[in-house]
């Protein structure tokens, strides 16, 4: 997915920029970047690969190069190298994005036909952030340029632009990914995650709306473009992406996860000895489930946090498998002979869960393994956010099972996505069988949306029900 952070201050911003960006590290594992501005040095940039190390480890030794900066932006990226520094008729600026551009090749060709050129490459193709920057500089103003991005791309794009006199923050026009503004005396900040704010003494001041453009300076904030009326914020922020202490649209992540588990327990008739979460994003749900069910919450599986990152996002499948195997350690003393219900955020490929379940039975002596999932089955690929490193919908376990049953992975998707239908139940039973589970239940869209606490019309549930295909165009038509 990726996360961005920016800050502007009446004094040095370097420490806040460094730590604020680091607090977005759970959103990506591939690259990190910082760009700053000072009247003495101008724009300064640094980018590092994070696949073999952490953000702080890579950037801390070189922070002195940013000395004296009073404004800056940072990014944790799962795709391209960024931020980029551009020189144009709009002036010099640095830009970072959280974006997925489905029609990237088409737009690249369009710009090449206009005699524009690309200097950056990302994994052998156009750098999406440079593509966005080139669309921006076609406008007469930053507002016009950003609206040009919204009108042209399919997918989503949230961005921060560092100029000589401030930081421009633009949220994607359907509001899928957040930007929250924080403030403290003499400084303003913007972040994908409110988690960045408390330890840096920022208070949440404002949440940028869908398609809204604001500019922050050290002494205040101004609106450049008003927010759109419609919103489709990504439900997976509360299911998986979000850090427990973060809040989006006024709805806290951990609170939603706890409520999700609590409500699911009230409708579940399984008998178990205890409940446990698959760390980290299954933990809050498991605590809620245990409270709702009236059974003990126990840490039957522990995550070795000092050195092992998330296994969801590494681009290499063998690395994902290695991380998944090494990071989770079963506690045999709490598992042997027990009936345990586990809570997890989602099932994507199913490979990690299948291997973990086998270990629980074969090595830890588990008697029964019941799995409860925070969201409905993932039936549709996400065209809006870099949800996983998957290149094909066939990496989804649901699609492989549908192909097994129907002979066509794209047939009768709506039936399989409908909770309670014969096709749905047949698919869930097959998933449970393939993964070796005693029982398996997924949450419903209705219960998930209720736990989040926003109206269904404002929450994107496309990966569960395919309902948001009409919003593929980034530009939100208010008519």
Which residues does each predicted region cover?
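Short glycine-rich phosphate-binding loop at a beta-alpha junction
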Residues: 28, 270-281, 285, 370, ...
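A glycine-rich phosphate-binding loop feature that marks nucleotide/adenosyl-phosphate handling sites
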Residues: 37-41, 164-166, 277-285, 292, ...
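A conserved beta-strand->alpha-helix junction
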Residues: 122-130, 297-310, 407-410, 439-452
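PRPP-dependent phosphoribosyltransferase catalytic core
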Residues: 165-166, 201-207, 358-479
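Extended, hydrophobic alpha-helical segments in both membrane/secreted and soluble proteins
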Residues: 275, 282-289, 293, 297, ...
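Short, glycine/charge-rich flexible loops or terminal/linker lids adjacent to PRPP-binding catalytic cores
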Residues: 294-340, 350-351, 379-391
């Amino acid at each position: 997915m990726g996360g961005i952070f920016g800050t502007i201050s009446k004094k040095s911003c370097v420490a806040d920029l460094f730590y604020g960006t680091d607090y977005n590290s759970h959103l990506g594992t591939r690259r990190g970047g910082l760009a700053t501005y000072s009247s003495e040095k101008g724009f300064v940039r640094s980018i590092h690969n994070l696949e073999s190390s952490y953000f702080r480890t890579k950037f801390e030794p070189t922070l002195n190069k940013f000395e004296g900066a009073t404004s800056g932006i940072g990014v944790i990226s799962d795709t391209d190298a960024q931020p980029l520094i551009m020189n144009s008729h709009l002036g010099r600026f640095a830009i970072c994005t959280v974006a997925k551009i489905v029609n990237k090749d088409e737009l690249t060709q369009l710009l090449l036909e206009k005699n524009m050129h690309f200097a950056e490459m990302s994994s052998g193709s156009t750098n999406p952030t440079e593509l966005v920057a080139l669309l921006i500089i076609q406008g007469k103003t930053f507002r016009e340029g950003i609206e040009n991005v919204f009108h042209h791309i399919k997918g989503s794009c949230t961005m921060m632009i560092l100029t000589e006199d401030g930081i421009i923050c633009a949220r994607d026009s359907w509001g899928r990914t957040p930007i929250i503004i924080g403030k403290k005396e003499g400084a303003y900040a913007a972040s994908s995650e409110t988690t960045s704010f408390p330890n840096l003494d920022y208070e949440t001041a404002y949440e940028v709306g869908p398609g809204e453009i604001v500019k922050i300076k050290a002494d205040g904030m101004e609106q450049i473009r008003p927010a759109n009326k419609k919103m489709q914020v990504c439900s997976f922020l509360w299911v998986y992406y979000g850090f427990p202490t973060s809040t989006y649209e006024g709805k806290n992540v951990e609170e939603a996860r706890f409520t999700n588990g609590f409500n699911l327990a009230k409708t579940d008739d399984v008998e178990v000895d205890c409940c446990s979460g698959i760390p980290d994003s299954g933990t809050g749900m498991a605590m809620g489930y245990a409270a709702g069910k009236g059974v003990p919450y126990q840490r039957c599986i522990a995550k070795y946090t000092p050195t092992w990152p998330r296994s969801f996002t590494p681009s290499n499948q063998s690395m994902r498998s290695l991380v998944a195997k090494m990071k989770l350690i079963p506690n045999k003393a709490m598992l042997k002979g027990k009936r345990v219900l586990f809570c997890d955020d989602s099932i994507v490929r199913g490979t990690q869960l299948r291997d973990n379940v086998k270990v629980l039975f074969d090595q830890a002596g588990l008697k029964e393994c019941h799995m409860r999932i925070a969201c409905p089955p993932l039936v549709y690929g996400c065209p809006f956010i870099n949800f996983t490193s998957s290149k094909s919908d066939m990496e989804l376990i649901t699609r492989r099972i549908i192909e097994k049953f129907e002979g066509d992975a794209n047939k009768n998707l709506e039936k399989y996505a409908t909770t309670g239908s014969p096709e749905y139940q047949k698919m869930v039973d097959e998933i449970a069988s393939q993964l070796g589970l005693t029982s398996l239940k997924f949450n419903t869209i209705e219960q998930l949306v209720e736990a989040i606490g926003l109206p269904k019309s404002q929450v994107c549930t496309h990966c569960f029900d395919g309902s948001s295909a009409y919003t593929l165009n980034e530009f939100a038509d208010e008519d």
